[in-house]
């Protein structure tokens, strides 16, 4: 296939840290690739967004130092395996900078995915706890958007549609 695979678990568990991302960057050094295909949840997606703007010699600190001038180095395709966060369509990655003692976002227009692919079948095997927390998150976002003082007819339409999709899933899981 001519592709390189990288499993986040090899580099640590939980939320992404600078140490984890730097280890992945070290692992990728010397490998030539044009695109990143991220299949996973929030940690995988956040790491992929960082990798898409990283040059071959970068460390996490380098990216934060030049955040205002980041450029896309690799095409980014995101396939989320959880529902509700919307991370596949945002341009922010939250990294716990353990070496600095802060948890802060890395934000750049260059971090938007080139494509986001939603595959409902990937959600069918979600453990109940993951489904529950991520779908509640999505439901809260939908209600929040609907009730916002800045809501408009279009945003309310999307909010209503989101709830129309989420609530039957709950009925299916719970009943």
Predicted regions and their residues:
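A broadly tuned preference for mixed-charge, low-complexity surface segments
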Residues: 31-42, 86, 90-92, 133-134, ...
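Active-site segments that bind and position negatively charged phosphate/pyrophosphate groups
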Residues: 145-175
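N-terminal small/polar loop signature for handling phosphorylated ligands or for N-terminal nucleophile
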Residues: 1-59, 68, 172-175
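General structural feature for long, well-ordered alpha-helical segments within catalytic domains
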Residues: 20-24, 29-32, 47, 135-138, ...
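A glycine/threonine-rich phosphate-anchoring loop and its flanking beta-alpha core
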Residues: 56-153
